């Protein structure tokens, strides 16, 4: 069986990507069913036992900026080795709620860690590995903020200011501009039915 595909969902907190992730994966599995392939759904930080432990630390404990980035990439290495690469090798498709673009957006754009440091970590951990497709849920920070305020107790990232998320969004869009062949941008300011219509277009293009 041919190697599987790797798809990532990205966007600032409150953009709505997690709301649509399972729906997208269910539709994708329907398409892949006759081929015998499966859809593996995962997330970052997380995806492995170590990754989930790191997730609790990263989302809830204050720490040095460079420590934060290093922990993100440590969890990613484990995630690649134990989950992503084995699934792709056996022909399954993997859909991850966040991957490396999030680290560039949050630790780079939002927190201001120099891009060259993140690029060095990316090369070390991933080599040339990149997602086959990244679905970027794009929305104005003020809209995302209103959505976040309507849900559970926020973690340390969700509690950041609109200015932080404006920088994070700008870095996401910069990444998308630099790799347009890899990104599909979804206007997530729309209603749920309209967003799903956009995602149907993404699925049709796979």
UniProtKB/Swiss-Prot annotation:
The keyword Secreted does not apply. NCBIfam families: DTMP_kinase (TIGR00041). Phosphorylation of dTMP to form dTDP in both de novo and salvage pathways of dTTP synthesis. The keyword Kinase applies. Its EC number is 2.7.4.9. Keywords: ATP-binding, Kinase, Nucleotide biosynthesis, Nucleotide-binding, Transferase. ATP binds at residues 11-18. It comes from Burkholderia mallei (strain ATCC 23344). GO terms for biological process: dTDP biosynthetic process; dTTP biosynthetic process; dUDP biosynthetic process. This is Thymidylate kinase. It catalyses: dTMP + ATP = dTDP + ADP. GO terms for cellular component: cytosol. GO terms for molecular function: ATP binding; dTMP kinase activity. It is an enzyme of class 2 (transferase). Belongs to the thymidylate kinase family. It comes from the Bacteria. It holds the Pfam family Thymidylate_kin. InterPro entries: P-loop_NTPase (IPR027417), Thymidylate_kin-like_dom (IPR039430), Thymidylate_kinase (IPR018094).
